């Protein structure tokens, strides 16, 4: 099956858009670490190549974890990420197919969660519509590790929704994930206040 995360958006794989923004944000916050959980060796190789190409002295706050069971459902990616995070104080789960999610929203979401969601979960919203990413303090780790099949962190989030902290994004489009693309399609992404057109190509 084709891997949508490797679709090229103007010569850049789709997963790289949010990935690159996360790296920039984490580089500004030395206490934050980014863990890439993937079942795809191609993505692991690309991330490692980026790490090797980083300028000497530049912090590349990324750890890569291959999760061979992720094809069984989202729960296995969640569990692999938590195990790799060790004694982290909290977990923030981002998905790689949200190329519209901005750098400003990444940083704003994480900073708000650190301030206001130390003991409760959180997620992003737009006009009352909830979406990814989702945040959990470490005390929810046991429940997250009990997830099975295609149940992601949102299943645990719903149990505690009345206590949750929410972060409002600026644009509805930021919450869109890309579940299907034709072989060539035009997409529009707003970056730094400027709307850009991207041509999307499938890697054969």
What do the PLM-derived regions correspond to, one by one?
Residues 106, 140-144, 183-184:
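A generic structural signal for short hydrophobic patches within well-formed alpha-helices
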Residues 1-13, 68-76, 100, 104, ...:
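Residues at secondary-structure transition points
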Residues 31-34, 89-90, 163:
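Residues at the starts of beta-strands that form the adenosine-phosphate
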Residues 17, 21, 76-80, 108, ...:
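Alpha-helical elements of Rossmann-like donor-binding domains used by nucleotide-donor carbohydrate transfer enzymes
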Residues 1-40:
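N-terminal glycine-rich phosphate-binding loop and ensuing alpha1 helix
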Residues 71-138:
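Conserved beta-loop-beta/alpha segment of the NTase-like Rossmann-fold superfamily
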Residues 42-90:
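Short phosphate-binding loop-to-helix
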Residues 146-204:
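Conserved alpha/beta core of the MobA/IspD/sugar-nucleotide pyrophosphorylase nucleotidyltransferase superfamily
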């Amino acid at each position: 099956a084709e891997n949508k995360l490797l679709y090229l958006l103007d010569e850049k794989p789709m997963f790289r858009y949010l990935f690159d923004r996360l790296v920039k944000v984490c580089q500004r916050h030395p206490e934050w670490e980014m863990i890439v959980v993937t079942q795809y060796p191609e993505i692991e190789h690309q991330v490692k190549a980026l790490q090797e190409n980083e300028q000497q002295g530049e912090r590349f706050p990324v750890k890569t974890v291959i999760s061979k069971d992720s094809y069984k459902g989202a729960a296995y990616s969640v569990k692999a990420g938590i195990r790799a995070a060790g004694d982290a104080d909290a977990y923030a789960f981002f998905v790689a197919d949200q190329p519209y999610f901005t750098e400003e929203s990444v940083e704003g979401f994480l900073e708000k969660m650190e301030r206001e969601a130390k003991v409760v979960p959180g997620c992003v919203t737009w006009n009352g519509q909830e979406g990814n990413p989702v945040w959990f303090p470490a005390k929810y780790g046991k429940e997250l590790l009990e997830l099975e099949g295609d149940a992601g962190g949102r299943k645990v989030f719903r149990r505690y929704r009345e206590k949750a902290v929410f972060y409002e994004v600026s644009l509805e489009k930021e919450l869109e994930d890309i579940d299907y693309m034709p072989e060539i399609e035009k997409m529009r992404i707003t970056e730094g206040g400027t709307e850009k057109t991207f041509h999307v190509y499938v890697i054969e």
